[in-house]
Design a protein with these regions (language model features):
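Catalytic cores and adjacent flexible loops of soluble metabolic enzymes
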Residues: 1-114, 118-259
Length: 259
């Protein structure tokens, strides 16, 4: 086991989960100076429903938000959640649109693309992944976690191997429903680690109350990075509190080292 990194979700997935993505750019900017000094692996700040919400509900330019966050977080890489061929919309887009969108996002401040397909179909992820690799920033490919007779840890590990072959820089286990149990997480991380030599990040919502224990067991199994949200933006349908996870690992060989 080694030092664990933390991705902070407060200004993207946390408010998307708790407040229907209604946090404005003006709400975010005052805290950015403090966030920038904490020492996170990534700060997730764009993508998901934020693009739609900016335009549909907040009367904001999502690209201007990205540029402002990039300027306000000079010491951090901003992560975005990208729906692969769907980009940030609700249908498949042409390859040339995907390529241009990804290049423009990288140019405006994205430092890591977390790319997922809800069907876990690598064919839907190939174009976005190639475009992200070409942009020169970090590329994380996500496994959408589900519990069915078909979705076994062995199949997820094989999927991770496919992602590695695509050129992923890291793998995310994306548990968007909070269904990943602690000991299942331990087994899943170990199985993926046996297949690929890449960092693994755990994204697990707190909806079912399992997430804190799940993050701990995943870290014990060798997960490299964990997704959390500042306590005021945590729990419920959001994520485990950053402060709780940092304190939980403090003094161990998994110590995050965060202030």
């Amino acid at each position: 086991m080694a030092k664990v990194g933390i991705t902070e979700l407060a200004i993207r997935d946390a408010h998307q989960s708790l407040h229907a993505t209604r946090m404005t750019t003006a709400d975010m900017l005052p805290i950015c100076d403090k966030l920038d000094k904490v020492g996170y692996k990534y700060i997730e700040g764009w993508g998901g429903a934020t693009y739609d919400s900016c335009i549909r509900f907040l009367n904001e330019d999502p690209w201007e938000r990205l540029r402002k966050l990039h300027a306000a977080l000079p010491n951090n890489k901003i992560m975005m959640l990208l729906r692969a061929q769907n980009l940030l919309g609700y249908k498949h887009y042409a390859d040339d649109v995907v390529e241009k969108f990804v290049a423009t996002a990288a140019k405006n401040g994205i430092g890591c693309f977390r790319i997922f397909d809800a069907c876990n179909d690598p064919r839907n992820m190939e174009c976005a992944t190639k475009a992200a690799k070409k942009s020169g920033v970090d590329v994380q490919m996500a496994i959408s976690y589900a519990v069915t007779p078909f979705h076994t840890n062995e199949k997820y590990a094989e999927l991770a191997k496919t992602y590695a072959d695509f050129g992923a820089d890291s793998i995310c286990i994306k548990d968007m429903s909070g269904l990943l149990k602690p000991y299942e997480a331990f087994d899943l991380v170990q199985k993926i680690k046996a297949k690929v030599d890449l960092p693994i990040e755990i994204h697990s919502h707190a909806t079912t109350g399992l997430s804190v224990a799940t993050l701990l067991k995943a870290a014990e199994a060798g997960a490299d990075w964990l997704d959390t949200a500042i306590s005021s933006m945590s729990m419920g349908t959001s994520h485990s509190p950053t402060e709780t996870v940092v304190e939980m690992l403090k003094g161990t060989d998994m110590d995050t080292g965060l202030d």
